Design a protein with these regions (language model features):
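A short gly/proline-enriched turn/hairpin at secondary-structure junctions
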Residues: 41-46, 80-90, 105
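Hydrophobic pocket/interface hotspot
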Residues: 59, 70-72, 79, 91, ...
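Short, cysteine-centered beta-strand-loop-beta hairpins and adjacent loop/turn segments enriched
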Residues: 88, 138-147
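C-terminal motif of bacterial Sec signal peptides marking the signal peptidase cleavage site
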Residues: 13-16
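Surface-exposed, charged secondary-structure patches
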Residues: 99-142
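Positively charged n-region of N-terminal signal peptides that target proteins for export
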Residues: 1-4, 18-19
Length: 174
């Protein structure tokens, strides 16, 4: 009888110590989309690092507070900005100059609606980290408050913002 109890006890201990496959996590991430570079190849996009979201939130907050030092510290030296009017802002210093003039003449305020982090490794093995976000921008134009919707595609390289594409749509008259 003692032997049977010992065998049953050892079986229970053995079963309870066995790892089940259900607790294993998936080691290969699922793609969430594709990047299609100029050569028309397709590169899978994956959910990105949430630290890029935090950095983007800091960047937007600095814009709302007109904190040019923080903005400059987050910009890559080789920063490029593509605003909706077709201009190109080439370099962090040019970006700060652009903002300095804008902030002197106006008080733009951004309100974030959504942020999506994604990333992919390009054909050269370089990690590209992006945040796509939507903001409502309220500004004063000709003494009238105007709100437009912005979508930003923001490229992060080594913890800095290297490039921003800004797309704009007028607020719907609903």
């Amino acid at each position: 009888m003692k032997k049977i109890l010992v065998v049953i006890l050892m079986t229970i201990v053995s079963i309870s110590c066995t790892n089940s496959n259900e607790s294993e996590t998936q080691s290969t991430p699922n793609p969430i989309g594709v990047e299609i570079p100029n050569d028309s190849t397709r590169i899978s996009l994956y959910g990105g690092d949430m630290n890029t979201i935090k950095l983007w939130e800091t960047y937007i907050k600095a814009h709302n507070e007109k904190d040019l030092k923080t903005i400059e510290s987050i910009n890559d030296d080789a920063f490029k900005g593509y605003p909706p009017n077709g201009d190109v802002i080439d370099g962090s210093k040019a970006h700060i100059g652009f903002l300095e003039e804008w902030f002197t003449n106006s008080s733009p305020m951004w309100r974030t609606k959504y942020m999506i982090a994604n990333e992919f490794t390009d054909n050269k093995g370089v990690l590209n980290q992006w945040v796509t976000s939507g903001q409502d921008l309220t500004d004063t134009v000709d003494n009238e408050e105007v709100t437009v919707h912005h979508v930003h595609d923001v490229l992060f390289v080594n913890g800095k913002i290297k490039m921003i594409y800004v797309y704009e749509r007028a607020k719907a008259n609903e």
